[in-house]
Regions:
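Non-catalytic C-terminal accessory/binding modules of secreted extracellular proteins
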Residues: 2-142
Length: 142
């Protein structure tokens, strides 16, 4: 399969109802995938500790969020600290991309990584993650 790459500019869900992207692992639909969402500390999200790209790892093969190593729905925290899973805090400025750590990519070898819960490669890579006003830009390879 040839890798496909495309660039996106995401508005907030409040401003752009179609502003959430689903990125399938392996480029084909299945029970494990990523959702990309622009979250800004304004409006209904004014209490967020930071703004940027939320990368959600979804695994519909899981029934709940009781296994902190393989949640049904888990936020891939840009800082890689896993503070949410370890109940260290309720979120911090390093959780969304690029975040306080200025992390502009997410892939199989990054921390956190885009690997599947079984450790296999998903083929998903995000690069060029940046913020411009209330929008988030990202290039997606799948």
């Amino acid at each position: 399969m040839t890798a496909k790459s495309a660039s996106y500019t995401l508005g907030t869900l409040e401003a752009d109802a179609g502003g959430c992207l689903r990125v399938w692992t392996g480029g084909a639909s299945g029970p494990e995938y990523f959702l990309l969402e622009n979250r800004q500390a304004s409006g209904r999200d004014a209490s967020l500790p930071g703004s940027g790209l939320a990368v959600w790892h979804i695994d519909e093969q899981r029934s709940d969020n009781t296994n902190p190593l393989a949640y049904l729905v888990g936020l891939m925290q840009a800082d890689g600290k896993r503070d949410l899973e370890l109940a260290r805090n309720g979120g911090d400025p390093g959780d969304l991309f690029p975040g306080s750590g200025k992390k502009t990519s997410f892939h199989d070898k990054s921390s956190p990584s885009s690997r599947a819960h079984d450790g296999g490669s998903t083929g998903v890579a995000l690069s060029g993650i940046s913020q411009a006003k209330n929008a988030v830009k990202v290039t997606v390879k799948r």
